[in-house]
Amino acid sequence: MIRGFIGVQIAPEVRSRISQAVAQLAPEISGIRWVREDNFHFTLKFLGVIEEPQIEPISNALAQAIRPFRRFTINAKGLGVFPDVKRARVLWVGLEGIDMPALAKSVETVLEPFGFPRENTIFRPHLTIGRWRHLSGSHQELGGKLKRRNDTEFGESAVDEVVLFQSVLKPGGAVYRPLKTVRLADDRMTS
């Protein structure tokens, strides 16, 4: 059994800029578990546990989902939290890109017949950089720190492929391993 998700990798230079911001934030924000730079990605759809024989059919469905899309650019900008500042659990970098909501919807549509239910939440493109177990410190203080960085630009990243990842849980944190990659430009799959 494999823990899987569908995601998009972020350009190395954007990951590096975000990592630099994390290094500046780390002393200011306590009680958070930071995501490692090599794990920065944008999740289109979390799958959970899948069986190995499902990998190929899921990859084929993914190719169908992205067929109408061509390479596009996303912009990483600003910081925010889910669900809100008073109950912060996830610290994220915002992602802007005109085709992202349509791409996520297309992926959800083709994966629904495999038993992966549609999300009941509003789609908010983001890149998780940290998670809290319990928020410590003032909510107003956290809100102020986020507001000061709301316009921080981390750069643009091309979206030219979508990846089926395996998430391997290890004592030091999750490790993400690409299982299948589908390119937006020509729908070819690679292992």
Show which residues each predicted segment covers.
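Histidine-dependent nucleotide/RNA phosphoesterase domain, centered on the 2H-phosphoesterase fold
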Residues: 1-191
